[in-house]
């Protein structure tokens, strides 16, 4: 009975480490680093540039509308679920323009859920400070996406990032890609450690491996 609860060491018993992922932390780190090492220089360059380009695009919208860049990034993040990147940017631009013009929220079309549009609208109404903007996003993936674009030491875990860590191709409609809070945090830690080993920011490593994984498997 105790063997299932404790690990025995030469110095006594200690509680077993709880595992919230389907592979160990060590294997997840190894899988992530292996995908990075299999990436071409073109894929590495594209991944390294992705989030900086995203911040530059957000900065352009911020300048256009005289809006703090972190507010624009928060709006982009709020509108990101199930949204293509180019359309995500256009939706953010349109929503901000409509808000400034005094249009009703309902008249502005976006390509995501209504509740996400309402969340973005609330951020525009309140113009909160940086930390409050993150709190208002209130969703692990969209908050994480905000942090990545803003350049924090962070990584967003989507279905592809999960598959890379497990070295397993699972479709994004599979229930296994619905990642709970504990699994999400554990996968983030795997990317953090792999990124430290490779002298990268975690979001850079994710973008590189995401690009390489999708190209490897022909994912559009």
Range-by-range predicted roles:
Residues 2-220:
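HhH-family (HhH-GPD) DNA N-glycosylase catalytic core used in base-excision repair
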């Amino acid at each position: 009975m105790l063997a299932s609860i404790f690990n025995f060491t030469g110095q006594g018993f200690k509680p077993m480490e709880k595992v919230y992922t389907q592979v160990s932390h060590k294997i997840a780190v190894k899988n992530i680093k292996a995908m990075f090492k299999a990436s071409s220089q073109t894929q590495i360059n594209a991944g390294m540039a992705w989030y900086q380009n995203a911040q530059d695009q957000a900065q352009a919208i911020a300048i256009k509308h005289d809006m703090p860049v972190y507010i624009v990034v928060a709006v982009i993040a709020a509108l990101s679920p199930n949204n293509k990147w180019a359309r995500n940017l256009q939706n953010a631009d349109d929503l901000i323009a409509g808000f400034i013009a005094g249009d009703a929220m309902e008249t502005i079309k976006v390509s995501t859920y209504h509740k996400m549009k309402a969340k973005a609208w609330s951020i525009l109404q309140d113009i909160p400070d940086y930390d409050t903007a993150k709190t208002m996003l209130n969703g692990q993936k969209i908050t994480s996406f905000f942090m990545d674009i803003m350049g924090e030491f962070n990584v967003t875990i989507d279905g592809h990032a999960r598959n890379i860590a497990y070295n397993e191709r699972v479709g994004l409609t599979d229930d296994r890609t619905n990642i709970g809070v504990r699994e999400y945090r554990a996968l983030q830690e795997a990317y953090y450690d792999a990124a430290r080993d490779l002298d990268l920011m975690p979001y850079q490593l994710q973008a590189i491996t995401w690009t390489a994984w999708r190209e490897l498997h022909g994912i559009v």
